[in-house]
Design a protein with these regions (language model features):
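Conserved helicase RecA-like core
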Residues: 1-130
Length: 130
């Protein structure tokens, strides 16, 4: 297996959840993080565009403003979502792998992999290498 390197300060943790409870754990993690660290930014990666939209709706339902970014959104909306997140207007970005490639996001405090990517190891590393 090819050796991969991540950022030295990266703290990686895994929480395996039953699929039917995944969203409840996600909400609890996001709400707790925002309560303890209100200025922290969070990216939630999802496997599909549909799941990304649903998680964005879930965040809105629990009172967490978020930006949603995936390939099915028009470019203008993607640009607007990314700008809102980068400027701090929203502290949560819900995205597919479209956000793990080549975007310049200077400070992300928490990356949550809502659904494990198809090529797990490589995708997770790309998502964490800002």
């Amino acid at each position: 297996m090819e050796e991969k390197h991540t950022v030295a300060e990266l703290d990686q943790r895994f929480l395996l959840t039953p699929p039917e409870a995944r969203d409840a754990y996600l909400v609890q993690l996001v709400l707790t993080t925002r309560e303890e660290h209100p200025k922290h930014s969070i990216i939630i990666f999802c496997k599909t565009c549909r799941t990304t939209e649903l998680v964005g709706l879930l965040m809105a339902k629990v009172g967490v403003g978020s930006s949603v970014l995936h390939s099915m959104k028009p470019q203008k909306e993607r640009t607007s979502s990314l700008a809102a997140f980068k400027s701090g207007q929203t502290k949560v970005l819900v995205a597919t792998d479209v956000a793990s490639r080549g975007l310049d996001i200077p400070q992300v405090n928490l990356v949550i992999n809502h659904s494990v990517p198809r090529d797990s190891v490589v995708s997770v590393l790309k998502r964490c290498m800002w």
